[in-house]
Amino acid sequence: MAAGAAVTLGGGLSACGSRGDVARAGTTDQWRQFQGATLNFISENTAPTAAIAANTKPFTDLTGINVNIVTLELTALVQRVALDLASGRAQYQVIYADPYQVLAPYQRGLVDLRTLEADPNLPRLPGGIGDFIPVQMDAAGRFVDPAAYYALPYDAPTMIWQYRQDLFAKYHDRMAHDLGFDPTPGGERTWEEYFRIAQWFNKNATSDVKYGTGHQARQHDSLMNDFSNVLWSYGGAYFDHGKEVGRLGARDPGPCRLDSEAAIAGAEFYNRLLSIADPASKTWDWDGVGAAFRAGRLAMCPNWHEFAASNEQVLPGKVGYAVLPKGPVATANMYGGTGVGISANTMPNERGAAWLFLVWATSPETQLANLKSKAGGGTPTRTSVYELPEVRAAEKRPSSMPNMLTAAAVRQAWTPERIGLRPKIPMWNECNTAIFTQLSTMLSGAETPANAMRSIKSRVDRIVARGWVA
C-alpha cells in the first residue's frame, strides 16, 4: 500500500481521531496549508477508488495530508453515510455520492462546492467545471438546482453493446443474406434487429457460442438497468419529463408512467428478448454476464463499458463496442456514474482539506494515471483527458489503456439524445426495488408484461406519495 493511505475493506477506520478542526498552516502554498491533516474517504469498491488507493502517495507528497479509504458494497455505503450525516459529525469528510442513493436523498448533507471553488485561498479546479462532460456534471453533481453542484464527476460506467467482432466478421455475409440487413453493431441497428441477430446465432453458430445474447437480468439493480435501455428506446418513461428528472432530479416526480402503451410495448419486447437469451441471464448481474461473455458463451450482450479491460485480457482483439440499438422512438445507453462530494458536517479547515483531495482526485493528471493503473482505473470524466494524444492513441489496438477501446461508443452514448438517466429522486432506492422485483416476476412467466407495468406503477405511486424526509 502506498504511503499516506490506509484502506479498510468493509470495516471501520484507522485513525479517526478526536473531533476537532484540523490546523491551518501559515504558508502561501495553497496545497500545503492543511499538512498533517487526515481525511477519511468512504467509497463504493470501484475501479477509480482502487487505483487511487494504490497510489495516494502523490497526493500526500503534494499536500502533507494522509488519506484513509474505506471501500464498501453500495448498500452498506449508503447506510454508513446516512448514519454519519445524521450524527452531525463528519467521520467521513469525503463521500462517494451515488446520485440516486446518496445525492438525491441526502443533498442537504453535502457541501455546495461552489463555495470552495470560489474561495481565493483554495486551489481552483483545473479547467473549471466546464472540463467535465456536461451531462455527467449534471447527472452526478447536481440536484434540482441547475447552478449548485454537490459532487464532481468521478466515474462514468455506461452500458453499451459488446460483441464478438471476430464472429461477426466470420458470419457477416451469411447473416446479411439470411436476415436481409447489415448486422454490423451500431446505433443504426434496432432492438428488433438485435433480437434477430441473437436468434440467428442461436440457430447457426453453436459451434462458436452457446447463445446469441446474454443479459444482467437477475432480481437486482442490474435488471432495472438492462430493462431501462429498452423501455426508453420504446418511448416509455418512469415519470413525466423523464430526461429532466434523470439529469437534474426532482423531489416529487409526480405519477409513475409505466402503465403507458409505450412502456408496456417496451416490456413486451424485453420479455420476448429474454425468452431467446441465455437462460442463465435471469441469474446474472453485470459481473455474471461479463464472465459468461469472456468465457465464450455469448455472441453479444449489453454491459457496462468498463468491462473492456477484462475483455481484452481474456479475448484480446476479439471484442467490439458500439452504442446500444435504437427502438421505435429513441435510443438509450444507461449511465451509472457517480461523483465525489464533501460532508456538510465538516469543519472549515477539514472542509478545505477535503476540497484539495477532490481537486486532486478528479484532476486530468490523476484521471490519466488511473487509466494506466494496474490496480483499477475506470474511465475519465473530463473532456481534456480524452483529447490527450496518448489517450487518443489508446483507442486503437494494441492499447495500453484497454478501456479506451470503448471511447468512440461512449462518446456517442454520453450525448444528451443517447444517454439513459434513471430518475434522480430521493426515494429511488425503494422504487428501484419495486421495479426489479416485479420485472423478475414478469420474466418468470407469473405475470404478463402489461400487468407487471401496472403493478410497478401502483407500487411506485405509493412510495412517491409518502414523500421523503432526510
Where are these regions (language model features)?
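N-terminal export signals
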Residues: 1-17
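Hinge/lid segment of periplasmic solute-binding proteins
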Residues: 25-33, 99-160, 226, 320-322, ...
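Short, well-ordered beta-strand elements
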Residues: 35-46, 65-70, 94, 211
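Extracytoplasmic/periplasmic substrate-recognition and gating elements
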Residues: 40, 86, 143, 147, ...
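Short, polar/charged alpha-helical segment
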Residues: 46-66, 162, 166, 435, ...
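Extracytoplasmic "Venus flytrap"/periplasmic binding protein-like
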Residues: 57-136, 170-172, 176, 292, ...
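Glycine-centered hinge/linker elements that transmit conformational signals in sensory
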Residues: 191-202, 230-283, 324
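Long, aromatic- and glycine/proline-rich binding clefts that accommodate carbohydrate-like moieties
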Residues: 317-324, 372-437, 441, 466-470
